[in-house]
Amino acid sequence: MFALREKYKNEIISQLKSELNMSNPMLLPKLEKIVISVGAGDYAKDSKIMQNIADTISLIAGQKAVITLAKKSVAGFKMREGMPMGVKVTLRGKMMYNFLEKLIVIALPRVKDFRGLKRNGFDGRGNYSFGLNEQLMFPEVVYDDIMVTHGMNITIVTSTHSDKEAFKLLELLGMPFAKGR
């Protein structure tokens, strides 16, 4: 499942060189990491559900997920220092390309009424973030094994600081952006 990585090396680099008018291949935008995170919300107090969420994200990512803990106590949110707040996993290298390929080819087409990802998810520094409503679109997730359905946030970090260059890179990689704005 290394087709996306090979496509980047063999095809996309040359396309980016010509479209962005860059002669130095080291200046071309590339993927640095993908961060998948889940905020626990009301489920933070139940350790079994938190572990189930972590196991589900680990299955999806192919890498062990980490339960994130609160750094400070905030009375307004009923949150204490050291309390579990969510789950995250950071993917780099082969695992990153495998996940992105699975997301583009398998998971996103399984979303009901999917019309493409919004283009306004760029942060002004070349990174793209979007959210998914549930985890059932991934083939590794078995409906009977999950305790709660939850969404997830996915952030794709690129080496460029330009949203235009990052958009071009993700578009060439096959990200299904919505038509129009």
From Swiss-Prot:
Keyword NAD: no
GO biological process terms held by the UniProt record: translation
Disulfide feature: none
Signal peptide: none
GO molecular function list: rRNA binding; structural constituent of ribosome; tRNA binding
Keyword Ribonucleoprotein: yes
InterPro entries in alphabetical order: Ribosomal_uL5, Ribosomal_uL5_bac-type, Ribosomal_uL5_C, Ribosomal_uL5_CS, Ribosomal_uL5_dom_sf, Ribosomal_uL5_N
Assembly behavior: Part of the 50S ribosomal subunit; part of the 5S rRNA/L5/L18/L25 subcomplex. Contacts the 5S rRNA and the P site tRNA. Forms a bridge to the 30S subunit in the 70S ribosome.
Function: This is one of the proteins that bind and probably mediate the attachment of the 5S RNA into the large ribosomal subunit, where it forms part of the central protuberance. In the 70S ribosome it contacts protein S13 of the 30S subunit (bridge B1b), connecting the 2 subunits; this bridge is implicated in subunit movement. Contacts the P site tRNA; the 5S rRNA and some of its associated proteins might help stabilize positioning of ribosome-bound tRNAs.
Family annotation (NCBIfam families): PRK00010.1
Name of protein: Large ribosomal subunit protein uL5
Native source organism of the sequence: Helicobacter hepaticus (strain ATCC 51449 / 3B1)
UniProt gene name: rplE
